[in-house]
Amino acid sequence: SLGAVTAALTLAFQNQEVVCETPVTNKMTTVTRKPDISKLDLNVLDDCKAPMRTRMETYVKWLQYQLVTAMQEEENAVNHGEIPAEFIVERWIRKEGGEGVSCVIQNGATFEKGGANVSVVYGKLPPQAIRQMSADHGNLLERVGYQTEGPDAEVDGLPFFATGLSVVIHPKNPMSPTSHFNYRYFELMHPEKLKNGSPNPRYDPNEPAAWWFGGGA
């Protein structure tokens, strides 16, 4: 998860830190053995009219559930006298906006250690973070089209949304390979109001100002 860290919200989407103005405070809320997907609407996965942020959040949560279920079944299938381990699933809430689910298994008969972690975070990126992000993403600021700093600043930051799934699996068998992959999605949105308090004519809750996917394996 993102952890209760400092004013640095790590958007690993750029393999760097993007500094936010407010501290990140997470609270662990529940501990279970499986992620809860009872509120997921899987129909949005194939709905091209649904917002991509909704589809991607649903996808990473559903994939996490499938992976944890399959790994637990594999762990339970041991037949050489060892006691299978169980996943510990912790759900956390980010006070500044967002949530996550961390699933960890360790010291098992099949898996030495494994984790499948989902993060869904949102809030406002300050101008400094937007400028840093723009430098690494092909003049993003110019493409978004807002003046963010100086006396003529139109906005004092931009709303953002980020979600992703990160998975690391270390089998107990030294002949079995370690697996590591992550899927990520990030978007910047048009603010509802400009810095001077007037309505933003470009605001559309379903049309991000910029978005991209990331990840690797």
Say what each PLM segment does.
Residues 39-54, 214-217:
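Charged, low-complexity surface segments at secondary-structure and domain boundaries
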Residues 16-43, 47:
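C-terminal segment of N-terminal export signals and the immediately downstream linker at the start
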Residues 1-21:
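Terminal signal-anchor or tail-anchor transmembrane helices
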Residues 48-153:
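Gly/Pro-rich turn-and-neighbor structural signature
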Residues 119, 123-217:
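Aromatic- and glycine-enriched beta-alpha-beta binding-site module
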Residues 4-10, 26, 64, 70-74, ...:
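Generic ordered-secondary-structure signal
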